[in-house]
Amino acid sequence: NIGEELIPGADLALKTLRNMDKQVRVLTNAASYDKSGAEKKFLDLGLYFSTEEIITSRDAALEHVTTGLWGVITTEADDLSDLKTEYIRLTDTQQDFNKVDGFLFLSTNGWNPKKQLLLRDSISKNERPVIIANADLVAPRENGFTLEPGFYGHDLMDLGASKVKFFGKPYSAVYKLLTKSLSEIPGDKIAMFGDSLHTDILGAAAQGWKTVLVTKDGLFSGFDTKSFCEGSGIFPNWRLGRINP
């Protein structure tokens, strides 16, 4: 999907894979909603995945939330029912930023430069853990790109913050969750389809998986991917224009 729109043919590709008795998993950096929310999002797009087939960066991040009072950055619609610790929602009150024991960054919906300045100021005066539950810097949407939590996490690191931890592709924790769900399948028999070199392809290759770069939908739409591969040194096993050409 691109934002809230289904990539043409994605439903047919999924049906084909299931008819071939292939195991299918969705590995997503979307952390704005819990597992049931992710399941509903795909269902609204016409794609059915069971809860066990969806692995999210949020899953990996929440496993690393410790006890204490956490300041959470997320959407108003997120009920945080899967967060099993004490928390407050961060808005634009400096004292709330200052009193928490750590920060959990789930979504940039409603986030803005003013709030980022509050976070930067609080961290600079009293450094605490920052969990970035979506490592993406940007995400392709229907009308361009949005800034994602990973962008703001790196902004903190540029200021010298040393307790920022990223979850989701390309970081290993989320891949380990997926591997656990496919424990009977060796890594070299898993193929990762994705549209980005620095998350999908890099992270999967590090796990010993095969990789397929989708070139005509998503991040590289309209660009020649070969030059980016050569510039980054990241090469997929295969390139595919679309997942259902």
Question: For the regions a protein language model found, what residue spans apply to each?
Answer:
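Asp-based, Mg2+/Mn2+-dependent phosphohydrolase catalytic module
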Residues: N1-K22, S36-I73, A77-P245
